[in-house]
From Swiss-Prot:
Consists of 3 domains; the N-terminus binds the ribosome, the middle domain has PPIase activity, while the C-terminus has intrinsic chaperone activity on its own. Keywords: Cell cycle, Cell division, Chaperone, Cytoplasm, Isomerase, Rotamase. This is Trigger factor. Residues 169-256 form the PPIase FKBP-type domain. Disulfide bonds: none annotated. It catalyses: [protein]-peptidylproline (omega=180) = [protein]-peptidylproline (omega=0). It is found in: Cytoplasm. Belongs to the FKBP-type PPIase family. Tig subfamily. Its EC number is 5.2.1.8. One of its GO terms (molecular function) is ribosome binding. NCBIfam families: tig (TIGR00115). GO terms for cellular component: cytoplasm. It comes from Microcystis aeruginosa (strain NIES-843 / IAM M-2473). Involved in protein export. Acts as a chaperone by maintaining the newly synthesized protein in an open conformation. Functions as a peptidyl-prolyl cis-trans isomerase.
């Protein structure tokens, strides 16, 4: 079979396939025989319909169309095998089907053209002399103290206060009512009873906590506050509102002692000393992990920057679908109504928003895989098996696709080995954490965009 290849943009190739005359004749005969067996014509038994009557009943054009569909399917498969081509996704017919019907004659050669996505050709840059800047996360002992403070707050006992005014750190129970500072009229839904106000700066509307400071139980106070411009309720966004606040109860927090009993209540450690040591180790490892991730990310992005590759649309669409699937599962775990978010109208926009991150993710994955291939980096089956065993010991009660799990673990470990190999050859400059934050990643931007709809769903539940 004669096949002419043409390289096309976006990792596509075009194929011009000439079907031999003998094939067009034999396929025509076979299709007609099959039709004769399957078509019911009154007065004739199945398979006994005379050829001429069959053609008259079905029409020459319909028979030709059936033959051409069979020819394209079979000959395309043969051409791909003959040329050693692995197609991604479904090939697209470039020839007009009507033109093929008009040109087709049994016993004469027929030529048709298709385009198809193929794996991209990747040209790596100078990967042995990379120079990158990454953020270093340094372990801060204060993180342990903050952890203790948070747990103490969670386990605090609330004790009624009668002899002083409210102060930061207290819990106030208040009734509130709001009216427009402009018209003096009450505002619907801006009122409530028994609202718990944790007296922490920055909570609720700006100025509310500060206004409550000093109030005592049963005291009533008016304060004028301005809602932020991005407040979900449009009728009060950026508007000044006069609040009438009635202090009903005031409570102080009594924090539990940091002793062995506390350690046993908040962890599986027996003593406070053991818990502190465990936390120190955890936060130290977390700092090391964050530094490693920053280095890996910088190396990967620099590797992609120096590489040349053209992504096929099939892979991009597949990655976009993967991103949306992950978002779907995350929103579901958050308790959001995913059917309200992932609507027929929303999905096209969500796919569009996810596309930049899909492209970036694909490039990073493919370039690292190409480097592993070029540098001869491998991962041992024994290491993969050990990792799988560790995972399965934690997921013993779940139905797992072992073949898929092995593939994912192998790819992850291969990428890990490749980046470790790359680190040894690269020049890496570490800067303090937060120094590079202005360079927001594509992934973060995509997550923020996809989460926007979820925020709207939750907006109605926001506190005043």
């Amino acid at each position: 079979m004669k096949v002419i290849q043409e390289k096309l943009p976006a990792s596509q190739i075009g194929l011009e396939i000439e079907i031999p005359a003998e094939t067009t004749k034999n396929t025509h005969e076979q299709v007609v025989k099959n039709l004769a067996k399957s078509v019911n014509i009154p007065g004739f038994r199945p398979g006994k319909v005379p050829r001429q009557i069959l053609l008259q009943r079905l029409g020459t054009k319909a028979v030709k169309a059936a033959v051409i569909e069979e020819l394209i399917e079979n000959c395309l498969e043969s051409a791909l095998k003959q040329e050693g081509i692995e197609s991604l996704g479904n090939p697209q017919l470039l020839s007009k089907f009507e033109d093929l019907i008009a040109a087709y004659e049994p016993g004469k050669a027929l030529t048709f053209s298709v385009s198809l996505d193929v794996a991209p050709t990747i040209i790596l840059g100078d990967y042995e002399n990379l120079s990158v800047t990454a953020e270093e996360t340094v372990y801060d002992p204060e993180s342990v103290e903050n952890w203790f403070k948070e747990r103490q707050e969670q386990l605090a006992t609330l004790v009624p206060v009668e002899d002083r005014g409210a102060q930061l750190g207290d819990v106030a129970i208040v009734d509130y009512r709001g009216k427009s500072a402009e018209t003096g009229e009450d505002i619907p839904d801006i009122d409530g009873e028994d609202l718990r106000v944790d007296m922490e700066a920055g909570r609720f509307i700006e100025g509310m906590v500060e206004g409550i400071i000093g109030m005592k139980p049963e005291e009533v106070k008016e304060m004028t506050l301005t809602f932020p411009e991005d407040y979900p309720k449009e009728d009060v966004a950026a508007k000044a509102v006069i609040f009438t606040i009635t202090m009903k109860e005031l409570k102080a927090k009594e924090l539990p002692e940091l002793d062995d009993d506390f350690a046993q209540e908040v962890s599986d450690q027996e003593t406070i000393a053991e818990l502190r040591a465990s936390l120190e180790k955890r936060f130290q490892e977390q700092a090391e992990k964050e530094t490693k991730e920053s280095i890996d990310d910088a190396l990967t992005k620099e590797l992609v920057k120096g590489a040349t590759l053209d992504l096929p649309e099939t892979l991009i669409e597949k990655e976009v679908t993967h991103i949306l699937t992950q978002s779907f599962m995350q929103f579901q775990q958050m308790g959001l109504d995913v059917n309200q978010l992932f609507t027929k109208d929303n999905i096209p926009k969500m796919r569009e928003n996810a596309r930049p991150d899909a492209i970036e993710s694909l490039k990073e994955t493919l370039v690292v895989q190409e480097l592993a291939k070029v540098a001869g980096i491998e991962v041992s089956p024994e290491a993969v098996a050990e990792k799988i065993a560790n995972i399965m010991s934690q997921l013993s009660d779940r139905d797992i696709d072992m073949q898929r799990l092995e593939q994912v673990i192998t790819e992850e470990m291969l990428a890990e080995n490749t980046l470790e190999w790359l680190k040894e050859k690269a020049t890496i400059t570490l800067v303090p954490k937060g120094s590079l934050e202005e360079e927001t990643s594509e992934e973060e931007e995509t997550e923020e965009t996809l989460a926007a709809a979820a925020v709207e769903v939750l907006a109605a539940e926001e506190e005043p």
